[in-house]
């Protein structure tokens, strides 16, 4: 993840990390103002000059303009591998890293789990979503997040990110993992399960948003 090719593959797609934005309704409109801004962003990506996309130097300039990367975000990214290794030791599961996974049926929808698990004998498939927050946030999540409902309540965008992973990979679960190496018990694992009603609502809103993107591009 986070390589230049990874960013290229995500371009113009509705992605797991942002999909929660589409799930917020406006007071009078189908989409909230935040959702509309995201739709405009996806439309702009899909309508980008291909010469810019395919030129590494120019595309790097573009990424520098659009990507926010705070110290806290970079620290979280740097800690992901440690979180994955500890998860493997605790669960005995072998986790592989994966890139952007496109949904098999919903056009322009993709998600990038922080890890993927597959058991060849049983066919069991699972995903990881790893967050490495500061200590106060770690304690908040550890005390308040225990299942689907509480994740939706505490951090709705992470809930929809976990759902997107399962939709795009066909996984039977996503383990939502929070990690902070400074704590005496540095990892908290919450099993998030698929919800077909949520999947259906997500698909509906993604398809409506995608139609708007196509209209925006064709209107030029």
Locate the predicted segments by residue.
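Charged, glycine-rich intrinsically disordered N-terminal tails and low-complexity linkers that flank
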Residues: 1-78, 86, 144-152
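Residue-level preference for nonpolar/small residues embedded in alpha-helices
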Residues: 79-80, 157
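Nucleic-acid nuclease catalytic cores
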Residues: 86-218
């Amino acid at each position: 993840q986070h390589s230049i090719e990874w960013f290229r593959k995500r371009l113009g797609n509705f992605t797991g990390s942002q999909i929660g934005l589409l799930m917020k309704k406006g007071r009078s409109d189908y989409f909230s103002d935040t959702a509309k801004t995201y739709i405009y962003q996806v439309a702009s990506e899909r309508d980008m000059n291909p010469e810019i996309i395919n030129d590494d130097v120019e595309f790097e300039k573009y990424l520098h303009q659009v990507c926010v990367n705070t110290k806290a975000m970079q620290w979280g990214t740097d800690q992901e591998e440690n979180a994955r290794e500890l998860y493997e030791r605790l669960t005995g599961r072998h986790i592989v890293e994966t890139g952007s996974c496109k949904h098999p049926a919903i056009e322009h929808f993709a998600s990038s789990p922080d890890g993927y698990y597959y058991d060849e004998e049983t066919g069991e498939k699972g995903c990881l979503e790893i967050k490495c927050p500061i200590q106060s946030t770690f304690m908040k999540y550890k005390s308040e997040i225990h299942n689907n409902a509480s994740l939706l309540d505490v951090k709705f965008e992470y809930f929809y990110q976990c759902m997107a992973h399962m939709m795009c990979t066909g996984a039977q679960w996503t383990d939502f993992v929070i990690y902070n190496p400074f704590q005496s018990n540095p990892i908290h694992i919450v099993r998030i399960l698929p919800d077909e009603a949520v999947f259906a609502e997500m698909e509906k809103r993604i398809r409506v948003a995608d139609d708007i993107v196509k209209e925006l591009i064709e209107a030029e």
